């Protein structure tokens, strides 16, 4: 049976001791004639890594692929392998594979006479593709019969069955790669290239395994089919530091949850924003139904019930208040004929007489609501330290203490209301003199209006701007009869069920109005008209105003009542000045003198 054998021959004279020569023969034995110097071409020094072939070199696919029972007679191919420094080699681990077995029954003398680098024996499995064009061969998978690697003596002549009985794994081999030659390249210019040592684990790799070589990822399919029977570009293999067993990281699991936001009301998962705030679908629907139905809820506890994912349905009042506290805007909820149509225009209007809803200035009313919310004390931070509902409290203490408390409550509210006024859109654009005039003229009106809206007249509980909570009886000796008028106004105001948006517009109109002595009354009038139109649109289309006739007139009718209450407040301050028990603060004295109507 023809076979190919590689012999580690003796180096010719003048050759480097590290030089190695391999000869291929087809007769089944080795001839020393091919190892004579005339067949050897020494064209490189010890640092050169090229190998010159004197005859035609088969393609690498042919060299590695076709192993069967015969091999055609080929011209001898002589390889000169000079090594410099340390030998470039492949380290084969002591791991057995299915076709690589260790045999330890070689003669001792043969093992001693073997060279350090070893020799290579390839068992052919099929005829290779000759270099002559037009020669047809049968192709077969590359790794069906990979053969074995063996070491043997330089003069050892072996047949196929002898080699299979006396084979041991090679410890070190030379690493090489073939490169495709250009068309018309002379036969003598075929080259093999050494790329340095490489550590190759011999354990079997599964099909489709991925490896990384020089930063490039490639896969080893199973089985590997032989490409076209011609040369192909050489595969550049990196140094030993880049191992072939590096695995590509697995892709991230598709079942990992996405990082969605949380509902600002209850803490449940929220995918997007609804009515200006990131909320879940449950809180969005609850807020929408509450606004559309204009529902009024009552808290059975202390109006501070916990609102979370598990307990959000226990108290509707506290849940709706938290929706407003986190910034959900009621004006965005549609309550007209387009409700539930997701922005699609109706095919036919219900009746041609129904007025089409204009686009309300959402930015203005939203800014007014935000300014009101920011200037009000939080319900969870109220100060009940001085609250007493004892009717005998008004008889305790002296008058100076109650008068001083009255002045303190006024001055404490002044800075808070001024901060609220500066957040009204367009107010800061007015002249500074007009701003001061409008604020000082409307301070007592705003003090009464805001106090009446947040207080609880049924229980006689008064909540001031700084968060202090007092009973009505605790304010009688300081406020006089004025406190009774405030409580009565508060009761009438809350009976109207004014929502926070409408109240914010009313509070702005109480200050932005015509006053005597304005430098630019035209600009004040323009701002006033914007707020009135905003309130009108809100009441008409978003607050059930179509079913509540004269509701807008009733809201605007509260402004003259505030003027009357403001006059009562000035009279109370004037009376306290006449008593002269406690001197008023300078800011209150200036306010009194600047706003006297007489």
From Swiss-Prot:
Domain of life, per the record?
Eukaryota
Could you tell me which residues belong to the region Disordered?
1-22, 337-361
User: What processes in GO biological process is this protein linked to?
Assistant: adult locomotory behavior; cellular response to corticotropin-releasing hormone stimulus; cellular response to oxidative stress; central nervous system neuron differentiation; central nervous system projection neuron axonogenesis; cerebral cortex development; DNA-templated transcription; dopamine biosynthetic process
The GO terms this record gives for MF are: DNA binding; DNA-binding transcription activator activity, RNA polymerase II-specific; DNA-binding transcription factor activity, RNA polymerase II-specific; nuclear glucocorticoid receptor binding; nuclear receptor activity; protein heterodimerization activity; RNA polymerase II cis-regulatory region sequence-specific DNA binding; RNA polymerase II transcription regulatory region sequence-specific DNA binding
Where do we find the motif nuclear export sequence (NES2) here? 568-577
Motif Bipartite nuclear localization signal (NLS1), residue numbers: 287-314
Asked whether the UniProt record includes Zinc-finger among its keywords, one would answer yes
Q: Which Pfam families match?
A: Hormone_recep, zf-C4
- Assembly information from the UniProt record: Interacts with SFPQ, NCOR2, SIN3A and HADC1. The interaction with NCOR2 increases in the absence of PITX3. Interacts with PER2.
What name has this protein been given in UniProt? Answer: Nuclear receptor subfamily 4 group A member 2
Q: Which organism is it from?
A: Rattus norvegicus (Rat)
């Amino acid at each position: 049976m023809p076979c190919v054998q590689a012999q580690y021959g003796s180096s010719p004279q003048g050759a480097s001791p590290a030089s190695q020569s391999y000869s291929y023969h087809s007769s089944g034995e080795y001839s020393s004639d091919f190892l004579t110097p005339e067949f050897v071409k020494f064209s490189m020094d010890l640092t050169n890594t090229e190998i010159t072939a004197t005859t035609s070199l088969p393609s690498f696919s042919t060299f590695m692929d076709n192993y069967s029972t015969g091999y055609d007679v080929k011209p001898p191919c002589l390889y000169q392998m000079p090594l410099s420094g340390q030998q470039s080699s492949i380290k084969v681990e002591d791991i057995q594979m299915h076709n690589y077995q260790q045999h330890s029954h070689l003669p001792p003398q043969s093992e001693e006479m073997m060279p350090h680098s070893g020799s290579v024996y390839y068992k052919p499995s099929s005829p290779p593709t000759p270099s002559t064009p037009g020669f047809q061969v049968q192709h077969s998978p590359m790794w069906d019969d990979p053969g074995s690697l063996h070491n043997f003596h330089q003069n050892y002549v072996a047949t196929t069955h002898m080699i299979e009985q006396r084979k041991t794994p090679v410890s070190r081999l030379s690493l090489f790669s073939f490169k495709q030659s250009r068309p018309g390249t002379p036969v003598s210019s075929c080259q093999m290239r050494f790329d340095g040592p490489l550590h190759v684990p011999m354990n079997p790799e599964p099909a489709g395994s991925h490896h990384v070589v020089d930063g490039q990822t490639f896969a080893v399919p199973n089985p590997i089919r032989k490409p076209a029977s011609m040369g192909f570009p050489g595969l550049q293999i990196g140094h030993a530091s880049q191992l072939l067993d590096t695995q590509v990281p697995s892709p991230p699991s598709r079942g990992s949850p996405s990082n969605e936001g949380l509902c600002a009301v209850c803490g449940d998962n929220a995918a997007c924003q609804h009515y200006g705030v990131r909320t879940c679908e449950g809180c969005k629907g609850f807020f929408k139904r509450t606004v559309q139905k204009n529902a009024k809820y009552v808290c059975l506890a202390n109006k501070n019930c916990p609102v979370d994912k598990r307990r959000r349905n226990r108290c509707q009042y506290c849940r709706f208040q938290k929706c407003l506290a986190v910034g959900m805007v009621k004006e965005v909820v549609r309550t007209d004929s387009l409700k539930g149509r997701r922005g699609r225009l109706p095919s036919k209007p219900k009746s041609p007489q129904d007025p089409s809803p204009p686009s309300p200035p959402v930015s203005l009313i939203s800014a007014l609501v935000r300014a009101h919310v920011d200037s009000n004390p939080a319900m969870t931070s109220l100060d009940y330290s001085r609250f007493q509902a004892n009717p005998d409290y008004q008889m305790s203490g002296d008058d100076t203490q109650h008068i001083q408390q009255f002045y303190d409550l006024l001055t404490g509210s002044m800075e808070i209301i001024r901060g609220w006024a500066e957040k009204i859109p367009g107010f800061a654009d007015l002249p500074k003199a007009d701003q001061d005039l409008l604020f000082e003229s409307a301070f007592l009106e705003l003090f009464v209006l805001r106090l009446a809206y947040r207080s609880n007249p049924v229980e006689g509980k008064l909540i001031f701007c700084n968060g202090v909570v007092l009973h009505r009886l605790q304010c009688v000796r300081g406020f006089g009869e004025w406190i009774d008028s405030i409580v009565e106004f508060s009761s009438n105001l809350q009976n109207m069920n004014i929502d926070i948006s409408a109240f914010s517009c009313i509070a702005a109109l109480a200050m932005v109005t015509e006053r005597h002595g304005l430098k630019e009354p035209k600009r004040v009038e323009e701002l006033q008209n914007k707020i009135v139109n905003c309130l009108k649109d809100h009441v008409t289309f978003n607050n059930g105003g179509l079913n509540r006739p004269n509701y807008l007139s009733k809201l605007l009718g509260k402004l003259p009542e505030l003027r009357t209450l403001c006059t009562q407040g000035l009279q109370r301050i004037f009376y306290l000045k006449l008593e002269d028990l406690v001197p008023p603060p300078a800011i209150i004295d200036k306010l009194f003198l600047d706003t006297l109507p007489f």
